[in-house]
């Protein structure tokens, strides 16, 4: 059980595939399992590993609260797919990635390439490019429910919502909203949005929303679901 070496491309690929149908490492809310895996990463995953990057940006938004997240933080080898060897206690093994679609792009290994070998290589390269161009591009999206809290009961909540909806980004679509009482006459704005994971992260949203500091005290992610 484990992800392998999360500082290697192979380990990050395992993490991406593990999170393809999950929002969190365990369960349906952020927990110490997410903290353990997050802390094992040396940096954000690259953009092409969009499931891993989406999860990384979401957990990063809990950085200030990570010590209070539920659960018990365990060793990294206790998380991840069961068919992956835990290499966290030793040097990660180098893995040889399989060629895409089992196509050999390079043909002969001889120093002097024959005309036939060159022709075969060119044909296989053209075949590979043709298959690659036919693969549909999947756009990963997530539905996010945000809780936006004002400073006090005198904050103009209509203006606050207007400020939020003025945030326009490629990959961001605002949805329905409502005011929810929180006590002492104060109401928070609960608003839905849909984002493209590789374009919009919760950390970017939080930065833009809290920039309206005259109206917004804080922003929290109330729910996060992959579409």
Curated annotation (Swiss-Prot):
Residue numbers of Phosphoserine PTMs: 108
Region (Disordered): 83-120
GO cellular component: a single term: eukaryotic translation elongation factor 1 complex
Pfam family, one: EF1_GNE
Keywords of the record: Elongation factor, Phosphoprotein, Protein biosynthesis
Gene Ontology biological process: translational elongation
Domain of life: Eukaryota
Post-translational note: Phosphorylation affects the GDP/GTP exchange rate.
Subunit structure comment from the entry: EF-1 is composed of 4 subunits: alpha, beta (alpha subunit of the eEF1B subcomplex), delta (beta subunit of the eEF1B subcomplex), and gamma (gamma subunit of the eEF1B subcomplex). Interacts with elongation factor EEF1A1.
Family assignment from sequence similarity: Belongs to the EF-1-beta/EF-1-delta family.
Function according to Swiss-Prot or TrEMBL: Catalytic subunit of the guanine nucleotide exchange factor (GEF) (eEF1B subcomplex) of the eukaryotic elongation factor 1 complex (eEF1). Stimulates the exchange of GDP for GTP on elongation factor 1A (eEF1A), probably by displacing GDP from the nucleotide binding pocket in eEF1A.
Record's protein name: Elongation factor 1-beta
Species name: Xenopus laevis
Gene (name only): eef1b
